[in-house]
Amino acid sequence: MRLVQLSRHSIAFPSPEGALREPNGLLALGGDLSPARLLMAYQRGIFPWFSPGDPILWWSPDPRAVLWPESLHISRSMKRFHKRSPYRVTMNYAFGQVIEGCASDREEGTWITRGVVEAYHRLHELGHAHSIEVWREDELVGGMYGVAQGTLFCGESMFSRMENASKTALLVFCDEFIRHGGKLIDCQVLNDHTASLGACEIPRRDYLNYLNQMRLGRLPNNFWVPRCLFSPQE
């Protein structure tokens, strides 16, 4: 196994099965963040992740972290909070603000550079990247964004500036996603936070099989239309 250098003149990727074991899932470097290349990557179960100043690195880890939406873990305290939630939740109202929030609300630094923000904003304008926003009155207090692949949603990042804001985004999105035929959320790599929400690890080959099936599925044509998903009780 060896790390592949991508060409700027081709959007082709090597097979994910050729990814390194250490660091887990590192497959290739280089290329660019053009919409065509990003979409090709997601269609093959590959995603970019790299530090500022480093070359673009492309990953497909084994195992893969996923969340079955119906398995979302909601604690008793979160259920009580959501029942009296002060938040309003929308979809695709403020993609730019959400990705900027994800980029800026990281004490330990972020991989979401200016180039990444611009790249995913282009994907959003093309109808492939989407955001969930959480508002306290007119203030954006949390949210999440990711890339749609049919009935599979590739979650990229989330942020929270008030109590339970990002959890509210995920809870409301999962409910809406399930109701309209959504099947699976890709979490990429398991961490303590995603594990606490019900995410689990599956073999990469299983994830790729699910991806190949689900990316051909269809949600309702109006699913990603900007709209309000949840309003606080009066």
UniProtKB/Swiss-Prot annotation:
| One Gene Ontology cellular component | cytoplasm
Q: Write out the catalysed reaction.
A: N-terminal L-lysyl-[protein] + L-leucyl-tRNA(Leu) = N-terminal L-leucyl-L-lysyl-[protein] + tRNA(Leu) + H(+); N-terminal L-arginyl-[protein] + L-leucyl-tRNA(Leu) = N-terminal L-leucyl-L-arginyl-[protein] + tRNA(Leu) + H(+); L-phenylalanyl-tRNA(Phe) + an N-terminal L-alpha-aminoacyl-[protein] = an N-terminal L-phenylalanyl-L-alpha-aminoacyl-[protein] + tRNA(Phe)
Chain segments annotated as transmembrane: none
Q: Could you confirm whether the keyword Transport appears in this record? A: no
Protein's GO biological process: protein catabolic process
Gene3D superfamilies recorded for this chain?
Leucyl/phenylalanyl-tRNA-protein transferase, C-terminal domain, Leucyl/phenylalanyl-tRNA-protein transferase, N-terminal domain
Q: Which domain of life is it from?
A: Bacteria
Q: Which PANTHER family match?
A: LEUCYL/PHENYLALANYL-TRNA--PROTEIN TRANSFERASE (PTHR30098), LEUCYL_PHENYLALANYL-TRNA--PROTEIN TRANSFERASE (PTHR30098:SF2)
What is the annotated role of this protein in its UniProt record? Answer: Functions in the N-end rule pathway of protein degradation where it conjugates Leu, Phe and, less efficiently, Met from aminoacyl-tRNAs to the N-termini of proteins containing an N-terminal arginine or lysine.
The name under which this protein is listed is Leucyl/phenylalanyl-tRNA--protein transferase
